[in-house]
Amino acid sequence: MQMSYAIRCAFYQLLLAALMLVAMLQLLYLSLLSGLHGQEEQEQYFEFFPPSPRSVDQVKSQLRTALASGGVLDASGDYRVYRGLLKTTMDPNDVILATHASVDNLLHLSGLLERWEGPLSVSVFAATKEEAQLATVLAYALSSHCPEMRARVAMHLVCPSRYEAAVPDPREPGEFALLRSCQEVFDKLARVAQPGINYALGTNTSYPNNLLRNLAREEANYALVIDVDMVPSEGLWRGLREMLDQSNHWDGTALVVPAFEIRRSRRMPMNKNELVQLYQVGEVRPFYYGLCTPCHAPTNYSRWVNLPEESLLRPAYVVPWRDPWEPFYVAGGKVPTFDERFRQYGFNRISQACELHVAGFNFEVLNEGFLVHKGFKEALKFHPQKEAENQRNKILYRQFKQELKARYPNSPHRC
């Protein structure tokens, strides 16, 4: 009897041990399965935001190379230029969107990346030593977390010559090292940025817009130079590439992209049909309509909005240049550079458009593509020194036009 009881106890102990072993194996299996699922999720995440030491090291190496020399001084000696803070492989025969921005306005890059499918080149101006530090950190964070930035964007930095930019510590400023996605970087930038009134830098340094424009477009055979707070129509890059593939004889021609501004409460139009509907009810108007109507009037907006709808981008009509037209355009070949003596507000773009005219360029308005600025441009939104700067640059513009006569002595055109 006692033997039978002992056998039964041993049997139950063995059964209990077996059940416990099975339970442990099941827990181990579930743990491994969960770990595998988590690994798959991580792999999917890292496919979009590669965190490998190699990719981070490449970014560091690129920034270190660009910053190591201490930059080069511009022709005036007032600014320090760092080329290739970020680099990307660009086909010299592609159409590059070239733009410029203060550090605060870099947040507009997000919208440009969505609308412009081709390569971008942006020149960033840092007015202070702190902004120069922030610019290098932003370059590090954006290139680390934004695949589109790594693939399509070249970035250059300009700061006053008395400052030098340093290799960034990604932990400073603003804890950008804690971010894990491209959207988080742009969201963080929107929170730390302090957008102000146009050209109001709060320092004794002038915003070198033409230096920045030249820097952004200097490696491009074909470039559309715009302000960073403008947005191109959907498919504009594809349309321009198709035009370029069909005919690369753009030398001597400026393909004008009509520019508009939209009421800030309105959604940005994607295509011409949406834009025209808003234009007809006054929610969209010609660019600079409230500040300088003649500056864009030769585009002939009434003619443009009434063109028949077409699927292909093409030049629609030729417009003779007249002062003070300053269109946004795409051109190839030897395009005159922007005169870097013009800084801050006034005559910085018209001076280059004037030289295009004297050099013999033709101006042809595209039928479908366009640019839109978010918000109506109003005089009260500019800094108090605007008029003084405008008068100073007006005097320089008169001198510039006299210089063009000597530069193009055989040209029949004058501004």
Swiss-Prot record:
Instruction: Give the enzyme's EC designation.
Output: 2.4.1.-
* Phenotype caused by lack of the gene: Early embryonic lethality.
Task: Report the cofactors.
Answer: Mn(2+)
- rRNA-binding among keywords: no
Membrane-crossing residues? 9-36
Q: Which residues are glycosylated?
A: N204, N300
Residue spans, topological domain Lumenal: 37-415
One cellular component term from this protein's GO annotations in UniProt: Golgi membrane
Q: Name one Pfam family in it.
A: Glyco_transf_49
**PANTHER family given in the database record:** BETA-1,4-GLUCURONYLTRANSFERASE 1 (PTHR46420:SF1)
Protein's name according to its UniProt entry = Beta-1,4-glucuronyltransferase 1
What is the scientific name of the source organism?
Mus musculus
